[in-house]
Amino acid sequence: MAPTQAGHDTAYLKETVGEALARGCAAAISAQPNDPVEYLGLWLLKYVKNAEVEGNFYRERQQDLQKKKDRLVKEAQSEQAAKSVALTRKEAADALALVTAEPRELLEAAVKLVKQHTAAGAAYAAVVAEPEEPDWVAPEDDEAAAVETEDEAAGGAALAEGEEPPPEPEPEPEAAPEDGEGDAPAPKIPRPVDYSKKYFAYVAASAGQEHVLEADLYRPAPPPEDADEDFKPEPLPYSFRVLDEKLPMLYVPNVAAEERVKFFRKFPKIGSYQACGVALPASGEFKALLAADTLFPEGSGQPLSADDRDFVWEVSQSLSRALEAVQARAAEALAATSAAEAVEELKAKVAELREQAAAEAAAAAPPPPAEGEEGEGEAPPAEEEPPAEEEAEEEEEEAEEGAEEGAEEGEEGEEAPPKPKKKKKVFNPIPGLQAAIEKLTAAAEAATEADARAQAAVALEKQALDEVVALASSHSDATLSSLRNMLSVPQGTYHVVKALLHLLGRPAASFSTWKRAHSHFSPRLFEDMAAYDATAERDMAVWGRVRSCYKAAPAAKKLDAEMPNTLFGSVALMYIKQVRRVARKAVLQRELAAKLAKAQQDLADKQAALVEAERVKAEREAEEARLAAEAEAAAAAEAEAAARAAAEAEAAAAAEAAAEAAAEAAAAAAEAAAEAGEGEAVAEREAAPAEAEAAPAEGEAAPPAEGEGEAQPAQEGSNSSSSSSDSSSSEESKAAAE
């Protein structure tokens, strides 16, 4: 164990202090100091210090080497990353040039690239737009032009049926080249683009900058004519330098130093601004503007780096190439096909249906009759008051004659019979009601036929409208593609599109400009055209706006030249006018339906009145029969009473006659007595019994008038009795006288 331990210690000493001791001993031997131990100790202390210094040196050197190595690695990585970023940017920019999409989608893609690959706080793009033409305004001094006609032309007065629009002036022939200039025609120099009236319409913006889409950048208004000398005009916005000075790129390191920079929210900020014009390579015409900024607080407020500015420029160039390709494809699509033949067939079919509908409408509602003539479809005259019944008049005349006869008899001293009650005139409404029902039945039948014809006219007009919708829908894809690929506004088509959108009930603010109308170019447009209820009652305020739009449209030839592949402008205008025709026929049909309903209601009322009149007549006849029976019974009783009264009167008359005869006899006797010398007392005694006998005779009842033959014996009996009484009285008077 001991040797092993000793060897281990030796190894330990050799590894730790062996080299230092050996070198120290060698130094002591070489120096031969007086005190070798002290020398060795000092040398070892110095050796330790030197070792520390050397260690620090090598350690620092190693650290420096490591830092340099790290820096080199980082620089290499940064260079590689920069190369990768540059390659990625280049690939992204080059890829944009190959994108096949709509212009707005290309602008949105460019904005996303700028925002993604640069330090810009915001990016946005605008199209170079033309001002839209104003709508048509009705002249104040021409009332006829302000009135809507049946089938008026788009740009002016109405065309008569079968009338063709006036031919457009032929283009002037080009001047022939002068001698010596050669046979080849001189190349046409393109006319420079006039940007003086154009403005920037922003259509794409990065996230958080959506408010930019509601803004448009216009040129300032010209100074007023009565402006003072101190008037300071509004400066032209800085971005218009791209158009006016033909500058492909603008850059402002600090927008606070440039007064011409306009802020969307009217609040000044700090930061940089860059704008690149997007021009078509072939023509050099600026079609759009791509811009980016670092405005604080959305951005850093610092200037854009050179790499960022270069990338924005590269994106604008790629966008130019992509837009040119899109415009070329759109132009090819416009010229590749033509819907002229289909539209002509549609016009012929619609004209035929319109002619049939017009015939049905004319039959349903004929024109008003001339003055003095009687119309067929007029309402029946008012029901006249029915005349009194003839029987009632005859009874009334008989009653009046009887009354007159009674009055004449009363003049002779006899008591006149009582006047019969005057019978009321009874009107019979049944004949008048029957005549009215006959007229109303004829009117209802005529109204039914007119309503059926009006419905047929509406159906024919709707069929024509469906034909127009079918043609428009069959070209919907091509139409939408053409509309969405147009950067410049097609003025004529835009007027018709506005009229169509007004008609379909879209908010007016949503298509006040061509930029805003872009949101309506979707399949829903044609779905709404097919679903529109043309028979509903028209809102004339809306139709006034519709008319102001489509009357501003140009002639058909110019309108068709804007979209020759589908002729959407002409088809949409035909749709609007056909909707108006359907609406007008629907108004006629509703009027005739109302007349039919009224005629049917009047007929039902008259029929009900006839039933009621017949019921009242039956009740009245029953009542009259009852009253007649009662009157007949009363008349019979009255006749019987009259007969009795007549008999009594005759008896009274006979008694009176007898009394008179007795009186005469008494007078004769008195005269005879006077002659014989008898006094007046004897005559009075003879007259008293005669008056006593005549008094009861006056109270006797007279026999009936009809039984005068039967009463004659009684009269004779009374005469005989009176004569016997006279004889007896004379005998008594004689006895008294004796």
From Swiss-Prot:
Residues 689-730 have a biased composition (Low complexity). It comes from Chlamydomonas reinhardtii. Residues 134-189, 357-426, 674-738 are annotated as: Disordered. In-gel analysis assays show kinase-like activity in vitro. However, such activity has not been confirmed using recombinant protein. Pfam families: Dpy-30. It is found in: Cytoplasm, Cytoskeleton, Flagellum axoneme. The modification Asymmetric dimethylarginine is found at R104, R260, R453, R538, R615. Disruption phenotype: Absence of radial spokes. PANTHER family: DPY30 DOMAIN CONTAINING 2, DPY30-RELATED. Flagellar radial spokes contribute to the regulation of dynein arm activity and thus the pattern of flagellar bending. They consist of a thin stalk, which is attached to the a subfiber of the outer doublet microtubule, and a bulbous head, which is attached to the stalk and appears to interact with the projections from the central pair of microtubules. Binds calmodulin in a calcium-dependent manner. This is Flagellar radial spoke protein 2. Keywords: Calmodulin-binding, Cell projection, Cilium, Cytoplasm, Cytoskeleton, Flagellum, Methylation. InterPro entries: Dpy-30_motif (IPR007858), Sdc1/DPY30 (IPR037856). Gene3D superfamilies: cAMP-dependent protein kinase regulatory subunit, dimerization-anchoring domain. Residues 134-153, 161-182, 371-415 have a biased composition (Acidic residues). CDD domains: DD_CrRSP2-like. One of its GO terms (molecular function) is calmodulin binding. Asymmetrically dimethylated at Arg-104, Arg-260, Arg-453, Arg-538 and Arg-615 during flagellum resorption. Probably methylated by PRMT1. One of its GO terms (cellular component) is cytoskeleton. Belongs to the dpy-30 family.
